[in-house]
């Protein structure tokens, strides 16, 4: 579905019925992908590109919000199929290019055994990162995309502020399924840092917010984030 005239959101559903992350197609004289979903999604994503009237070679860039496998599972295949340049934050790049192994979640042993049958789905293939993105960088796409370093879920998590569209894409800084929430603590390296990143986000100017998981909020999104930031801060203080 189109969130704005130039930003398309594709759900992360696989044929198995299990959910991965949302994928975003930014349309501006070609296509920029934001995240790539679980492994095995590349054909579906390229079909979306074609359905919107573009060729695989029209995909110039792939921006990675963070290194988790439900966001980069199809990255290597899509990079090879399109020739796109991959961009990510320096703190997450070593996990994307295979310099460092993907860290497992902070989970009890029994949960690891429960998830082990899904290991092939959650696996990743290393992909070269062509450009490192730092806080405050601006990309010449859709009138200028501002890179926000929003760590917490991972050390190198980023969000994308697109003033022209009055939109911010936040990866897994927040999720929105029935209500706004933080991502699961089992898969978050620093919850306290994540709260700080949410407060940082609440101080910016946007009207629409799109998430790695869940439906976008398409009106008064900044106010919703500010309210949520106040709520979690109050909870942390025990009020």
Enumerate the predicted regions with their spans.
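Short Pro/Gly-enriched beta-strand edge/turn motifs at strand-loop
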Residues: 3-12, 116-121, 140-142
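Conserved beta-strand hairpin/beta-sheet module of binuclear metal-dependent hydrolase folds
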Residues: 1-52, 159-171
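Short, acidic/turn-prone active-site loops that include or flank metal/cofactor-
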Residues: 15, 91-93, 173-174
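Residue-level marker for buried hydrophobic side chains located in beta-strands
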Residues: 32-34, 63, 86, 167-169, ...
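Short glycine-/acidic-enriched loop or helix-start segments at secondary-structure transitions
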Residues: 19, 43-45, 73-75, 97-98, ...
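Active-site HxH/HxHxD metal-binding segment of metal-dependent hydrolases
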Residues: 40-42, 50-131, 234
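Metallo-beta-lactamase
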Residues: 38-40, 123-124, 128, 138-140, ...
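C-terminal regulatory/interaction regions
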Residues: 236-239
């Amino acid at each position: 579905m189109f969130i704005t005239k130039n930003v398309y959101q594709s759900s992360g559903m696989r044929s198995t019925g299990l959910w991965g992350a949302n994928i975003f197609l930014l349309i501006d004289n070609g296509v920029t992908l934001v995240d790539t979903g679980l492994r095995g999604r590349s054909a579906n994503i390229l079909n979306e590109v074609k359905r919107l009237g573009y060729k695989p070679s029209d995909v110039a860039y792939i921006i990675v919000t963070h290194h988790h496998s439900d966001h980069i599972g199809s990255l290597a295949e899509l990079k090879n199929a399109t020739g796109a340049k991959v961009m990510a934050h320096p703190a997450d790049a070593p996990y994307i290019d295979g310099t460092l192994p993907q860290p497992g979640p902070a989970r009890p042993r029994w949960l690891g055994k429960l998830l082990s049958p899904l290991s092939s789905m959650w696996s990743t293939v290393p992909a070269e990162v062509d450009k490192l993105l730092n806080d405050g960088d601006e990309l010449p796409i859709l009138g200028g995309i501002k890179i926000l370093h929003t760590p917490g879920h991972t050390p190198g998590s980023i969000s994308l502020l697109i003033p022209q569209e009055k939109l911010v894409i936040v990866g897994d800084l927040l999720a929105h399924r029935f209500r706004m929430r933080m991502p699961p603590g089992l898969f978050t390296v620093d919850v306290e840092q994540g709260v700080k990143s949410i407060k940082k986000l609440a101080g910016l100017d946007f009207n629409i917010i799109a998430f790695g998981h869940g439906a976008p909020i398409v009106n008064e999104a900044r106010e919703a984030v500010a309210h949520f930031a106040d709520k979690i801060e109050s909870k942390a203080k025990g009020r």
